[in-house]
Amino acid sequence: MRILMNKFVGAVQLIIDIGNTSISFALYRLDKMQIYCKLGTKRDLSFKELYKFLKVKFDYKVDQVFVSSVVPVIDTVLINAIVSLYKVNPLFIRFDLSYDLSFNLYNNNRFVLGSDVFANLVGAIEYYNINDALVVDLGTACTIFAISRREGILGGLINGGPFTDLNALIQNAYLLNDFNLAVPKKLLGLSTIDSVNSGVIYQYKYLIEGVYHELRHNYDKEFRLIITGGNSYLVLPLISVDFIANLYLTLEGIRILGNAFKGDY
């Protein structure tokens, strides 16, 4: 099977994932992650603030910058900071661009996908060199998407993430105060807070495992379960089926797509 390689051998690549809650940055050299850090997402993020952050954290000669963004209001600020500091134009990953991958993403249907989900699915198949995957990303939202090397993207489900669900409940329940979510010690809580905590977290365990078993039965495929996302730590200890945990899956997918992009930017 063909292995995707970086077209620019030895290139230093800055990979950026702009999410609703945080922005992840990773510096790669020779296809290996060297530095990783995060910055809170602010819709009023200024050029000066971002430039200073990049200068402090990534003061290197960067050859390429690949970006996934689900917060378009930040994109222009990012472009200006990248061009000013590194003198390169960033490539924004999108589902509707052309890529030289080892499989066809759209054998059956052409989906309109967020660039983060798109990167996750490509990362699952290409990075792990597997045939079928169920990819879960627990962040601001909970996305669960299935992909097959033979049949392409099969579709998915999107729910609110753990803290999104908790905040919605707190805002609509007069007597419920804010608290920090944690991995439940047991299924049944003995106080309101413990019960809410258990309810918020356990729903993802049963959702993930339920979808996993249903898909393996309906599609007759050996889906590999891959879990990522900044809030996945709340659910991972509870999952009772085999899974792969990779906090950097989205970044890996962005890097793979950037290297596989067919065109100029």
UniProtKB/Swiss-Prot annotation:
Q: Name one GO cellular component term.
A: cytoplasm
Q: Does the keyword Nucleotide-binding apply?
A: yes
Q: Where in the cell is it found?
A: Cytoplasm
Cofactor mode of binding and number, as noted: A monovalent cation. Ammonium or potassium.
Q: InterPro entries this protein is in?
A: ATPase_NBD (IPR043129), Type_III_PanK (IPR004619)
What does this protein need as cofactor? NH4(+); K(+)
Query: GO biological process: what's one of them?
Result: coenzyme A biosynthetic process
**So where does substrate get bound?**
114-117, 192
Query: What UniProt keywords apply to this chain's record, in alphabetical order?
Result: ATP-binding, Coenzyme A biosynthesis, Cytoplasm, Kinase, Metal-binding, Nucleotide-binding, Potassium, Transferase
Q: Molecular function terms in GO for this entry?
A: ATP binding; metal ion binding; pantothenate kinase activity
Which residues of this UniProt protein bind ATP?
Answer: 17-24, 140
List the catalytic residues: 116
Transferase recorded as keyword: yes
Report the enzyme's class at the first EC level: transferase
Annotated residues that bind K(+) are located at 137
The biological pathway it contributes to is: Cofactor biosynthesis; coenzyme A biosynthesis; CoA from (R)-pantothenate: step 1/5
| Chief site of localization | cytoplasm
Q: What EC identifiers does the entry list?
A: 2.7.1.33
**Reactions catalysed, as given in the entry:** (R)-pantothenate + ATP = (R)-4'-phosphopantothenate + ADP + H(+)
The family assignment reads: Belongs to the type III pantothenate kinase family.
Q: What does this protein do?
A: Catalyzes the phosphorylation of pantothenate (Pan), the first step in CoA biosynthesis.
Quaternary data: Homodimer.
Q: What is this protein called?
A: Type III pantothenate kinase
